[in-house]
Amino acid sequence: MDLGRPNKEYIRYVFKTPEYEKFVSSLNPKVRQKFDYVVDVITTIYNVPTKFIKHLENTDLYEMRVSIGTNEYRTVIFAIDNHNFIEAGNVILLNGFFEEGQQRLS
């Protein structure tokens, strides 16, 4: 687990499990760059748009959302010190996966 502390300008500390790190390292560089961008948004923006973070209904979990073209990637997130992601100062990225899109019928 990555326990590195960001500097004080950050709103949230983001911890990364080995499973998350392994998933992200398996992705191509362009996708990894987008993951880094979304993590930066999470750490520096108080009200993170639902484009990047969405609460999973009936759970204490959230998902981080990364979109590259038509490809959708998700990472399960847990807010460590608050039930509400926005109020959380510490979050952990648990694991990621590729979400297959729905095919459009013509």
Predicted features and spans:
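Conserved catalytic cores of phosphodiester-cleaving nucleases, focusing on short active-site segments
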Residues: 94
